[in-house]
Amino acid sequence: MFKRMVLVALLGVFSSVSLSAKSLLRDDGILVSDLKGMKSELSDAPAWVFEDAKVPYEEMGVAYIPVNNKYLGIEQATLNAKLSLIVVFHEIMMKYKKRFMEQFHESEQTATNISYAIYNYLATKIQVAYTYTNLKSEVAVVKIKLVGCQIEQIKRYLKASVENLNDNEIAYIAKVAQKEFGSVCALR
């Protein structure tokens, strides 16, 4: 009973804080595709802000800067970029999920757990490469990329994270990971 009361109180505090903070944030969003149309406003921006990603598994994120705090803008832009990259990872995993389930007679839950384990591993390998802020336009731009990914680490991470995977299943997943992430993930 006491835990429930504490939980309700915390939920109320978080709700009121988020509702009061919402008025500080802009309702209109900004997209990476909007940056090319903002060249005059962002005239001091480095060239990478307006370029498309040249390297696989490199994403950009953009956000408005709330309450003149560039660090909050950078944080939000980084989260937006990470979400974009996770969507890319998810699309790759969905492409192989059904085939994996049929070939190894595994449940959908096991396939989902594998996906989550790989997302978690890859999320630890995402680094911010560049940041740019413009306080006048209230815009923060971040470029992130996948760095230090290793297929052997993915295999170890899977063994530790997903129960009952045998060596053949892990080898198959490693082969798929090498095929999809080979340009940015080393074998060792």
Language-model segments: which ranges?
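Short amphipathic alpha-helical "recognition" segments used for binding
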Residues: 7-8, 79
